[in-house]
Amino acid sequence: LLSSAASDVYKRQVKKINKCLDNKTNSIISIFSGRMADVGKDPVPIIKKAVQMTNKKNKVEILWASVREPYNYIQAKQLGCQIITMPPKIIEKVSNFGKSFDRLTKDTVIAFLKDSRKSRFRI
């Protein structure tokens, strides 16, 4: 989990940036949540705090950058991120939300079967 020292650095950065912004200029604070997660840091507390710190400025938006897994989309929405950047493969997986587990499993097996036939390997 994110150490309190590292967490404080992120919070201080957002606080400093937020102080510099006014209510007249559209602004985006981009937080590279995926990179935090890549090194074992939980980005959720930082994003939550950033949204809280900036919520009084209606022209400031928080961006959850570097989504690594589909569930990050849900986390970002729940925390109030206004912008979420996702690679195409993650967008495709998000489109599976709401599918039954059985349907997703069947679709995966069918895709695997198609790929294995294309490879001409025998299974």
Task: Please annotate each region the language model reported.
Residues I28-I29, V39-N58:
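Short loop-to-alpha-helix "cap/lid" segments that border enzyme active sites
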Residues S4, N26-S30, K59-L63, Q82-I83:
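Structural preference for beta-strand elements that scaffold enzyme active sites
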Residues S7, V39, I62-A65, F101:
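Glycine- and other small-residue-rich loops at beta-strand/loop junctions that grip anionic moieties
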Residues D8, F32-M36, A65-Y73, K89-I91:
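Active-site beta-loop-alpha junctions enriched in small/polar residues
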Residues L1-A6, Y10:
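Single conserved hydrophobic/aromatic residue that forms the stacking wall/gate
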Residues Q13-D38:
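Bacterial c-di-GMP phosphodiesterase catalytic domain signature
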Residues K11-C20, E69-C81:
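Catalytic cores of alpha/beta
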Residues K93-R122:
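C-terminal helical cap(s) of enzyme catalytic domains, especially alpha/beta-barrels
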